[in-house]
Regions:
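Topology signature of small-to-medium multi-pass alpha-helical membrane proteins
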Residues: 1-178
Length: 178
C-alpha cells in the first residue's frame, strides 16, 4: 500500500466515526430529553460520552489532515474502547458495528507509522495547534477511561479492555521511537 492510499483510508475511518457520532446524537437526543424529565442525572451520565464521541473523530481528523498520523491511532484507540464498552453494556448494535469497521480500517493502515513524518507526542517542529490537538485527544481518552466507570458502572469491563488496548498501543509506539 502506498502512503496516499493509507492517508485516504485514515480520512474515511475518522469521517465514518463522525457520521456515527451524529447518528448517535439524533437517536439518543429524544430519549435523553424524555429521561431528563424524570431524572436530571441522566443528562450528566450521558453528556460526557456523547461529547467525547464528537471530539475524538474531529480532533483526530484535523490532526490527520495536517499529516499527523497520531490522529488515526488516537481515534482507533477510542473506537476500540467505545466498542468494548458498548458491547458489554448494550450488546451488538449498528454503532458497535461502525466502530469495528473503523478499527479494521485503522489496522489496514497501521503501517503509516513506519513513515518518517509520523509523530506521537510533542514535537518542537510542529505548530502549537498540532500539539494542542494531540493533547486534547489524549485528554479525552484518558479522562473518559478514568471518569467513565464512575458515570457508567455497567461499562467496567469495557473500560478495562479499552485501557489495556490503549496501553498496548502506547507500548508499541515507544518501541517504534527507539
Amino acid at each position: 500500500m502506498n502512503s496516499k492510499l493509507l492517508y485516504r483510508i485514515g480520512i474515511v475511518a475518522m469521517s465514518a466515526m463522525l457520521i456515527v457520532a451524529f447518528y448517535l446524537a439524533l437517536v439518543f437526543y429524544p430519549v435523553l430529553v424524555e429521561s431528563a424529565e424524570e431524572d436530571i442525572d441522566v443528562i450528566f451520565r450521558a453528556l460526557f460520552p456523547l461529547i467525547s464521541v464528537f471530539i475524538a473523530p474531529v480532533a483526530g481528523l484535523v490532526l490527520y489532515l495536517r499529516k499527523k498520523p497520531a490522529g488515526l491511532t488516537l481515534c482507533a484507540g477510542y473506537a476500540i474502547f467505545m466498542t468494548a464498552a458498548s458491547v458489554f453494556s448494550i450488546g451488538l448494535t449498528g454503532f458497535n458495528v461502525a466502530n469495528v469497521l473503523t478499527v479494521i480500517l485503522y489496522l489496514a493502515s497501521a503501517v503509516v507509522y513506519l513513515l518518517p513524518q509520523s509523530r506521537f507526542s510533542f514535537d518542537p517542529d510542529s505548530s502549537p495547534v498540532d500539539n494542542a490537538l494531540n493533547s486534547l485527544m489524549w485528554a479525552v481518552l484518558l479522562v473518559f477511561i478514568v471518569i467513565g466507570p464512575v458515570l457508567l458502572p455497567a461499562r467496567y469491563i469495557g473500560m478495562i479492555v479499552g485501557l489495556v488496548v490503549l496501553l498496548l498501543v502506547l507500548r508499541g509506539f515507544v518501541g517504534l521511537k527507539k
